[in-house]
Amino acid sequence: MTRYAGWIIVASGLLAQAGCATHGPAEQARYQVSQTCNGALHCYATIQAALDATEGAPEGGWILVQVGPGHYIEKVTLKRSRVRLRGAGVDRTFLQFDIPAQDAARYHRDHWGTPGSATLTIDADQVIVEGLTIENTFDFLSNDALPDDDPRKIVNSQAVALLLDKHSDRVLVRDAALLGYQDTLFADGKRGLVRHSTIAGNVDFIFGGGQLLVVDSTIRSRPRTAAFKANEVQSIVAAPSTLLAQRIGIVVYRSRLTREQGVPDGSVALARPWHPTRNFPDGRYADPNAVGQALYIDCFMDAHILPDHWTSMAGTARDGSKTALFTPQDSRFFESGSRGPGAHHADIGIKWTDAPSIAEVTRVILDDWPEASIGGLP
């Protein structure tokens, strides 16, 4: 048994909090979001207005933004540290916005549509998001059904629900739902923790180069409407772009990989390696140092999981063409303790064996993470 920063890692790898029964930090300021404020003090009609108002609160303490029941149709950016964004429950409070990457470049500092499409962007340290559904409501399925040569087809159909942006760290999402199709959760910052939540999507719907731990959650694959050949990979759960210098990437622990109606058996890969296209002194091409890491530990897998479990991903070659192919065999992919109809898998020659244990993962993810910002784990 190991102790650190108020936490205990027991032999099984479970996390337990030492001497603390609280479920969140004490707040020094509170703001309310409601569709019926009726002139109440510190009550706002939109989530963004409430977050903007928090800028006037003194620095240092935690701030609670309590969001009432309802559908809030807005793009939200959270930049203040030590904010607790709390809804009335995943079936009562909904933060939603409808935009794909193709139309969202104007919302991003580098004019990149994928992060620009995010319904909720978090770019702060020590943030708790709980008790609400966050969704990008772009109609992916209607677009997916269009032929590639249809002029109405949106090519860049990524539509992010939650972006953990570059300056984010120690972000906890719990008792929440993240809904989308392609690119639902973009982990592009430092450390994130998702617990007792649902993440739903189909193409690369948990992705990025950040350190992300998903615990005791449901990873729900959603259907495609495009035409596929028999036994063709239709969807991918994770697309990590973890830098080689980073020990931890995307880790799914003690969670359930389920599917919605219409997702065929053997059609969904656990992960594929994303090598983002970046600028280098000798050109612009797929980053060779982004050797993605994805770990699945003690997870239930339904029959929709691909028999090979992992698949390849194309990237930008040095000549600018999309001919570079990155394979699972050259990535940092690993699983242990899998169970369920989709747990059995073929041997495709995965050679990477230096996978961290769940105890190491939790030490890295929770290092210097004040226990007040996490609550009771587990």
Predicted regions and their residues:
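Positively charged n-region of N-terminal signal peptides that target proteins for export
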Residues: 1-4
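Bacterial N-terminal signal peptides
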Residues: 6-17
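Sequence-level preference for short, compositionally simple segments enriched
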Residues: 25-378
